[in-house]
Amino acid sequence: MSMPFRVLGIETSCDETAAAVVEPAADGRGGRIMAEALLSQVEEHRPYGGVVPEIAARSHLDHVDSLVIRALGEAGLTVHDIDAVAATGGPGLIGGVIVGVMTAKAIAQVAGKPFIAVNHLEGHALTVRMTAGIDFPYLLLLASGGHCQLLAVEGVGRAKRLGTTIDDAAGEAFDKVAKMLGLGYPGGPAVERAARRGDPRRFRLPRPLLDRPGCDLSFSGLKTAVRQTVEKLPPGPLSEGDIADLCASFQAAVADCLADRCRVAAGIFSARHGRGRPLVVAGGVAANASLRAALTEVARQADMTFVAPPLALCTDNAAMIAWVGVERLRLGLVDTMDFKPRPRWPLDPDAPKAAGAGGVKA
Protein backbone atom coordinates (compact mmCIF):
# COMPACT_ATOMS: atom_id res chain seq x y z
CA MET A 1 0.00 0.00 0.00
CA SER A 2 1.56 3.30 -1.07
CA MET A 3 2.11 6.25 1.24
CA PRO A 4 0.52 8.50 2.19
CA PHE A 5 -2.53 6.68 3.48
CA ARG A 6 -5.65 8.65 2.61
CA VAL A 7 -8.56 7.73 4.82
CA LEU A 8 -12.21 8.75 4.57
CA GLY A 9 -13.76 9.24 8.01
CA ILE A 10 -17.45 9.34 8.95
CA GLU A 11 -18.84 10.65 12.26
CA THR A 12 -22.49 10.13 13.30
CA SER A 13 -22.36 9.36 17.03
CA CYS A 14 -24.47 12.25 18.34
CA ASP A 15 -25.77 15.46 16.74
CA GLU A 16 -23.17 16.19 14.06
CA THR A 17 -23.11 14.41 10.72
CA ALA A 18 -19.63 14.70 9.23
CA ALA A 19 -17.23 13.30 6.65
CA ALA A 20 -13.55 14.09 6.13
CA VAL A 21 -10.48 12.92 4.26
CA VAL A 22 -7.15 12.92 6.10
CA GLU A 23 -3.60 11.93 5.18
CA PRO A 24 -0.33 11.83 7.17
CA ALA A 25 2.11 14.71 6.86
CA ALA A 26 5.01 14.16 4.48
CA ASP A 27 7.49 13.82 7.37
CA GLY A 28 5.28 11.29 9.13
CA ARG A 29 4.59 13.55 12.11
CA GLY A 30 1.02 14.73 12.29
CA GLY A 31 -1.51 14.83 9.51
CA ARG A 32 -3.30 17.01 7.01
CA ILE A 33 -7.04 17.44 6.61
CA MET A 34 -7.58 17.30 2.86
CA ALA A 35 -11.30 18.07 3.11
CA GLU A 36 -14.12 18.00 5.63
CA ALA A 37 -17.87 18.50 5.51
CA LEU A 38 -20.05 18.84 8.60
CA LEU A 39 -23.73 19.41 9.26
CA SER A 40 -24.76 20.37 12.80
CA GLN A 41 -28.20 19.35 14.05
CA VAL A 42 -28.30 22.01 16.78
CA GLU A 43 -31.32 23.81 15.32
CA GLU A 44 -33.26 20.55 14.99
CA HIS A 45 -32.75 19.71 18.66
CA ARG A 46 -32.90 23.21 20.16
CA PRO A 47 -36.70 23.18 20.72
CA TYR A 48 -36.28 20.07 22.91
CA GLY A 49 -33.40 21.40 25.01
CA GLY A 50 -31.19 18.44 24.12
CA VAL A 51 -30.50 15.72 21.59
CA VAL A 52 -33.47 13.55 20.59
CA PRO A 53 -31.99 10.20 19.43
CA GLU A 54 -34.70 9.46 16.84
CA ILE A 55 -34.37 12.89 15.23
CA ALA A 56 -30.58 12.56 15.24
CA ALA A 57 -30.60 9.16 13.54
CA ARG A 58 -33.03 10.32 10.84
CA SER A 59 -30.94 13.41 10.13
CA HIS A 60 -27.77 11.32 9.83
CA LEU A 61 -29.54 9.04 7.37
CA ASP A 62 -30.77 11.99 5.32
CA HIS A 63 -27.42 13.78 5.04
CA VAL A 64 -24.46 11.42 5.41
CA ASP A 65 -24.29 10.45 1.72
CA SER A 66 -24.18 14.04 0.48
CA LEU A 67 -21.50 14.96 3.03
CA VAL A 68 -19.32 12.04 1.94
CA ILE A 69 -19.69 13.12 -1.69
CA ARG A 70 -18.82 16.71 -0.75
CA ALA A 71 -15.72 15.73 1.25
CA LEU A 72 -14.41 13.48 -1.51
CA GLY A 73 -15.11 16.16 -4.10
CA GLU A 74 -13.27 18.85 -2.14
CA ALA A 75 -10.31 16.49 -1.74
CA GLY A 76 -10.34 15.81 -5.49
CA LEU A 77 -10.74 12.08 -4.92
CA THR A 78 -13.15 9.24 -5.61
CA VAL A 79 -13.82 6.28 -3.34
CA HIS A 80 -11.29 4.33 -5.42
CA ASP A 81 -8.50 6.79 -4.55
CA ILE A 82 -8.73 6.40 -0.77
CA ASP A 83 -6.92 3.67 1.16
CA ALA A 84 -9.56 2.91 3.80
CA VAL A 85 -12.93 3.96 5.18
CA ALA A 86 -13.24 4.68 8.91
CA ALA A 87 -16.41 5.32 10.88
CA THR A 88 -17.31 5.86 14.50
CA GLY A 89 -18.29 2.42 15.78
CA GLY A 90 -19.23 3.67 19.26
CA PRO A 91 -19.79 4.81 21.90
CA GLY A 92 -22.74 7.02 21.08
CA LEU A 93 -26.42 7.11 20.25
CA ILE A 94 -26.80 3.70 18.68
CA GLY A 95 -29.16 4.76 15.87
CA GLY A 96 -26.69 7.30 14.56
CA VAL A 97 -23.71 4.99 15.01
CA ILE A 98 -25.47 2.33 12.94
CA VAL A 99 -26.03 4.83 10.10
CA GLY A 100 -22.34 5.73 9.97
CA VAL A 101 -21.08 2.17 10.23
CA MET A 102 -23.41 0.86 7.54
CA THR A 103 -22.49 3.73 5.22
CA ALA A 104 -18.77 3.11 5.71
CA LYS A 105 -19.14 -0.64 5.18
CA ALA A 106 -21.06 -0.08 1.95
CA ILE A 107 -18.40 2.29 0.59
CA ALA A 108 -15.61 -0.08 1.63
CA GLN A 109 -17.27 -3.02 -0.09
CA VAL A 110 -18.01 -1.14 -3.31
CA ALA A 111 -14.48 0.30 -3.52
CA GLY A 112 -12.71 -2.81 -2.26
CA LYS A 113 -11.08 -0.92 0.62
CA PRO A 114 -10.50 -1.84 4.27
CA PHE A 115 -13.13 -0.86 6.83
CA ILE A 116 -11.99 0.53 10.19
CA ALA A 117 -14.30 0.93 13.18
CA VAL A 118 -13.12 3.78 15.38
CA ASN A 119 -13.76 4.32 19.07
CA HIS A 120 -15.20 7.85 19.18
CA LEU A 121 -13.30 8.56 22.40
CA GLU A 122 -10.03 7.55 20.76
CA GLY A 123 -10.84 10.04 18.02
CA HIS A 124 -10.74 12.81 20.62
CA ALA A 125 -7.74 11.22 22.34
CA LEU A 126 -5.53 11.07 19.23
CA THR A 127 -6.53 14.36 17.56
CA VAL A 128 -3.42 16.10 18.91
CA ARG A 129 -1.25 13.50 17.19
CA MET A 130 -2.68 14.82 13.94
CA THR A 131 -2.56 18.53 14.82
CA ALA A 132 0.62 18.72 16.91
CA GLY A 133 2.51 15.54 15.98
CA ILE A 134 3.17 14.62 19.61
CA ASP A 135 4.58 11.25 20.65
CA PHE A 136 3.20 8.71 23.09
CA PRO A 137 2.79 8.63 26.05
CA TYR A 138 0.80 11.65 27.24
CA LEU A 139 -1.70 12.49 29.96
CA LEU A 140 -5.19 13.17 28.64
CA LEU A 141 -8.18 14.90 30.15
CA LEU A 142 -11.12 13.91 27.95
CA ALA A 143 -14.07 16.12 28.86
CA SER A 144 -17.28 16.31 26.85
CA GLY A 145 -21.03 16.13 27.21
CA GLY A 146 -21.04 12.39 27.81
CA HIS A 147 -17.57 11.62 29.12
CA CYS A 148 -15.05 12.93 31.65
CA GLN A 149 -11.92 10.86 32.16
CA LEU A 150 -8.21 11.18 32.92
CA LEU A 151 -6.12 8.70 30.95
CA ALA A 152 -2.52 7.81 30.25
CA VAL A 153 -2.48 7.41 26.47
CA GLU A 154 0.34 4.97 25.72
CA GLY A 155 -0.32 4.00 22.11
CA VAL A 156 -2.97 3.35 19.50
CA GLY A 157 -5.63 1.31 21.26
CA ARG A 158 -3.71 1.53 24.55
CA ALA A 159 -4.97 3.84 27.29
CA LYS A 160 -4.93 3.43 31.06
CA ARG A 161 -7.67 5.20 32.96
CA LEU A 162 -6.48 7.13 36.01
CA GLY A 163 -9.82 8.65 36.94
CA THR A 164 -13.37 9.21 35.76
CA THR A 165 -16.53 10.97 36.84
CA ILE A 166 -18.57 9.05 39.39
CA ASP A 167 -21.80 10.73 38.23
CA ASP A 168 -22.29 13.50 35.64
CA ALA A 169 -19.75 14.42 32.97
CA ALA A 170 -18.49 18.01 33.00
CA GLY A 171 -20.18 18.86 29.70
CA GLU A 172 -23.44 17.35 30.90
CA ALA A 173 -23.29 19.59 33.98
CA PHE A 174 -22.77 22.64 31.75
CA ASP A 175 -25.80 21.67 29.66
CA LYS A 176 -28.03 21.10 32.69
CA VAL A 177 -27.02 24.36 34.37
CA ALA A 178 -27.68 26.21 31.11
CA LYS A 179 -31.15 24.67 30.91
CA MET A 180 -31.77 25.52 34.57
CA LEU A 181 -30.93 29.17 33.88
CA GLY A 182 -32.92 29.36 30.64
CA LEU A 183 -29.87 29.72 28.42
CA GLY A 184 -30.92 27.08 25.90
CA TYR A 185 -29.03 24.42 23.99
CA PRO A 186 -26.13 23.78 23.52
CA GLY A 187 -25.34 24.76 27.09
CA GLY A 188 -21.55 24.88 27.23
CA PRO A 189 -21.01 27.89 24.95
CA ALA A 190 -24.01 29.68 26.47
CA VAL A 191 -22.66 29.33 30.02
CA GLU A 192 -19.19 30.47 28.91
CA ARG A 193 -20.60 33.58 27.21
CA ALA A 194 -22.67 34.53 30.25
CA ALA A 195 -19.75 33.86 32.61
CA ARG A 196 -17.61 36.48 30.88
CA ARG A 197 -19.90 39.18 32.31
CA GLY A 198 -20.18 37.62 35.77
CA ASP A 199 -18.44 37.65 39.15
CA PRO A 200 -17.07 34.17 39.94
CA ARG A 201 -16.82 35.06 43.65
CA ARG A 202 -20.45 36.05 44.24
CA PHE A 203 -21.82 32.57 44.90
CA ARG A 204 -19.94 30.05 47.06
CA LEU A 205 -20.35 26.73 45.27
CA PRO A 206 -18.84 23.38 46.34
CA ARG A 207 -15.81 21.75 44.75
CA PRO A 208 -16.70 18.03 44.96
CA LEU A 209 -13.82 15.63 45.76
CA LEU A 210 -11.32 18.52 45.95
CA ASP A 211 -8.11 17.47 47.74
CA ARG A 212 -9.33 13.86 48.02
CA PRO A 213 -7.02 10.96 47.09
CA GLY A 214 -7.30 9.58 43.57
CA CYS A 215 -8.31 11.16 40.28
CA ASP A 216 -12.06 10.61 40.13
CA LEU A 217 -14.39 13.56 39.53
CA SER A 218 -17.94 14.47 40.50
CA PHE A 219 -20.24 17.19 39.16
CA SER A 220 -23.72 16.13 40.27
CA GLY A 221 -23.46 17.88 43.64
CA LEU A 222 -22.20 21.06 42.00
CA LYS A 223 -25.16 21.06 39.62
CA THR A 224 -27.52 20.56 42.57
CA ALA A 225 -25.86 23.43 44.43
CA VAL A 226 -26.57 25.76 41.51
CA ARG A 227 -30.24 24.77 41.58
CA GLN A 228 -30.43 25.34 45.35
CA THR A 229 -28.75 28.73 44.96
CA VAL A 230 -31.31 29.73 42.34
CA GLU A 231 -34.13 28.69 44.68
CA LYS A 232 -32.76 30.97 47.42
CA LEU A 233 -32.83 34.05 45.19
CA PRO A 234 -35.87 36.38 45.27
CA PRO A 235 -38.91 34.93 43.44
CA GLY A 236 -39.40 35.84 39.81
CA PRO A 237 -37.27 35.77 36.68
CA LEU A 238 -33.51 35.83 37.22
CA SER A 239 -31.79 39.07 36.31
CA GLU A 240 -29.02 39.09 33.70
CA GLY A 241 -26.60 39.86 36.51
CA ASP A 242 -27.75 36.86 38.54
CA ILE A 243 -27.39 34.57 35.54
CA ALA A 244 -23.94 35.91 34.68
CA ASP A 245 -22.71 35.55 38.27
CA LEU A 246 -24.14 32.04 38.59
CA CYS A 247 -22.45 30.99 35.35
CA ALA A 248 -19.14 32.54 36.37
CA SER A 249 -19.28 30.90 39.82
CA PHE A 250 -20.22 27.53 38.34
CA GLN A 251 -17.52 27.69 35.67
CA ALA A 252 -14.88 28.62 38.26
CA ALA A 253 -15.91 25.64 40.39
CA VAL A 254 -15.62 23.27 37.42
CA ALA A 255 -12.20 24.73 36.57
CA ASP A 256 -11.01 24.21 40.15
CA CYS A 257 -12.23 20.61 40.17
CA LEU A 258 -10.63 19.74 36.85
CA ALA A 259 -7.38 21.48 37.76
CA ASP A 260 -7.14 19.68 41.11
CA ARG A 261 -7.77 16.25 39.61
CA CYS A 262 -5.30 16.96 36.80
CA ARG A 263 -2.62 17.86 39.37
CA VAL A 264 -3.10 14.52 41.08
CA ALA A 265 -3.10 12.66 37.75
CA ALA A 266 0.01 14.54 36.61
CA GLY A 267 1.89 13.32 39.67
CA ILE A 268 0.86 9.72 39.05
CA PHE A 269 1.59 9.95 35.33
CA SER A 270 5.01 11.60 35.78
CA ALA A 271 6.05 8.97 38.33
CA ARG A 272 5.36 6.29 35.71
CA HIS A 273 6.51 8.00 32.53
CA GLY A 274 8.87 10.78 33.60
CA ARG A 275 8.49 14.55 33.68
CA GLY A 276 8.12 16.85 30.71
CA ARG A 277 5.45 14.86 28.87
CA PRO A 278 2.36 16.58 27.39
CA LEU A 279 -0.87 17.29 29.26
CA VAL A 280 -3.56 17.06 26.58
CA VAL A 281 -7.11 18.33 26.92
CA ALA A 282 -9.69 17.13 24.38
CA GLY A 283 -13.44 16.95 23.90
CA GLY A 284 -16.04 19.68 23.66
CA VAL A 285 -15.30 21.10 27.12
CA ALA A 286 -11.72 21.74 25.95
CA ALA A 287 -13.09 24.62 23.86
CA ASN A 288 -13.82 26.59 27.05
CA ALA A 289 -11.19 29.34 27.36
CA SER A 290 -11.41 29.58 31.15
CA LEU A 291 -10.83 25.86 31.58
CA ARG A 292 -7.94 25.93 29.11
CA ALA A 293 -6.30 28.71 31.12
CA ALA A 294 -6.64 26.78 34.38
CA LEU A 295 -5.19 23.62 32.89
CA THR A 296 -2.37 25.48 31.17
CA GLU A 297 -1.28 26.61 34.64
CA VAL A 298 -1.52 23.03 35.95
CA ALA A 299 0.76 21.88 33.13
CA ARG A 300 3.27 24.63 33.90
CA GLN A 301 3.39 23.72 37.58
CA ALA A 302 3.80 20.02 36.76
CA ASP A 303 6.61 20.66 34.24
CA MET A 304 4.40 19.39 31.43
CA THR A 305 3.54 20.86 28.04
CA PHE A 306 -0.10 21.89 27.61
CA VAL A 307 -1.55 20.73 24.30
CA ALA A 308 -5.11 21.04 23.00
CA PRO A 309 -6.65 20.66 19.54
CA PRO A 310 -7.76 23.73 17.59
CA LEU A 311 -11.19 24.85 18.76
CA ALA A 312 -12.91 23.49 15.64
CA LEU A 313 -11.58 20.01 16.41
CA CYS A 314 -12.58 19.94 20.10
CA THR A 315 -16.19 19.15 19.29
CA ASP A 316 -17.28 16.08 17.30
CA ASN A 317 -15.87 15.93 13.79
CA ALA A 318 -14.95 13.41 11.11
CA ALA A 319 -11.30 14.45 10.76
CA MET A 320 -10.48 12.86 14.11
CA ILE A 321 -12.20 9.64 13.01
CA ALA A 322 -10.27 9.59 9.74
CA TRP A 323 -7.03 10.23 11.66
CA VAL A 324 -7.55 7.23 13.93
CA GLY A 325 -8.17 5.33 10.71
CA VAL A 326 -4.73 6.46 9.49
CA GLU A 327 -3.11 5.43 12.78
CA ARG A 328 -4.76 2.01 12.76
CA LEU A 329 -4.12 1.41 9.05
CA ARG A 330 -0.40 2.01 9.61
CA LEU A 331 -0.46 -0.83 12.14
CA GLY A 332 -2.60 -3.13 10.00
CA LEU A 333 -5.52 -2.84 12.42
CA VAL A 334 -8.62 -3.14 10.26
CA ASP A 335 -12.05 -4.61 10.94
CA THR A 336 -14.24 -7.17 9.25
CA MET A 337 -17.74 -6.57 7.96
CA ASP A 338 -19.00 -8.46 11.02
CA PHE A 339 -18.23 -5.52 13.31
CA LYS A 340 -21.29 -4.54 15.37
CA PRO A 341 -21.87 -0.92 16.48
CA ARG A 342 -21.38 -0.41 20.21
CA PRO A 343 -23.38 2.00 22.37
CA ARG A 344 -20.65 1.61 25.00
CA TRP A 345 -16.95 1.20 24.23
CA PRO A 346 -14.51 2.12 27.02
CA LEU A 347 -11.01 3.28 26.12
CA ASP A 348 -9.64 1.19 28.97
CA PRO A 349 -11.75 -1.97 29.12
CA ASP A 350 -9.74 -3.25 32.11
CA ALA A 351 -10.47 -0.23 34.31
CA PRO A 352 -12.70 -0.95 37.31
CA LYS A 353 -16.07 0.74 37.44
CA ALA A 354 -15.86 3.94 39.46
CA ALA A 355 -17.83 4.03 42.71
CA GLY A 356 -21.23 5.53 42.04
CA ALA A 357 -20.67 5.59 38.28
CA GLY A 358 -23.92 3.94 37.30
CA GLY A 359 -24.73 6.67 34.80
CA VAL A 360 -21.33 7.07 33.19
CA LYS A 361 -21.77 6.59 29.47
CA ALA A 362 -18.36 5.18 28.62
Curated annotation (Swiss-Prot):
Q: Which residues bind substrate?
A: 142-146, 175, 188, 288
Lineage runs:
Bacteria, Pseudomonadati, Pseudomonadota, Alphaproteobacteria, Rhodospirillales
**UniProt name for this protein:** tRNA N6-adenosine threonylcarbamoyltransferase
Q: What does this gene product do?
A: Required for the formation of a threonylcarbamoyl group on adenosine at position 37 (t(6)A37) in tRNAs that read codons beginning with adenine. Is involved in the transfer of the threonylcarbamoyl moiety of threonylcarbamoyl-AMP (TC-AMP) to the N6 group of A37, together with TsaE and TsaB. TsaD likely plays a direct catalytic role in this reaction.
Obligatory cofactor(s): Fe(2+)
* Basic and acidic residues bias (residue ranges): 342-351
Report residue spans for region: Disordered.
Answer: 342-362
Kindly give the Pfam families that the UniProt entry links to this protein: TsaD
Q: Which residues bind Fe cation?
A: 120, 124, 316
Is Cytoplasm one of the keywords? yes
Cofactor binding remark: Binds 1 Fe(2+) ion per subunit.
Report the locations given in the UniProt record: Cytoplasm
Name the EC number(s): 2.3.1.234
List the record's Gene Ontology CC terms alphabetically. cytoplasm
Catalytic reaction equation(s): L-threonylcarbamoyladenylate + adenosine(37) in tRNA = N(6)-L-threonylcarbamoyladenosine(37) in tRNA + AMP + H(+)
**Similarity section:** Belongs to the KAE1 / TsaD family.
Q: Report the GO molecular function annotations.
A: iron ion binding; N(6)-L-threonylcarbamoyladenine synthase activity
What's the main place this protein lives?
cytoplasm
Q: Where are the transmembrane segments?
A: none
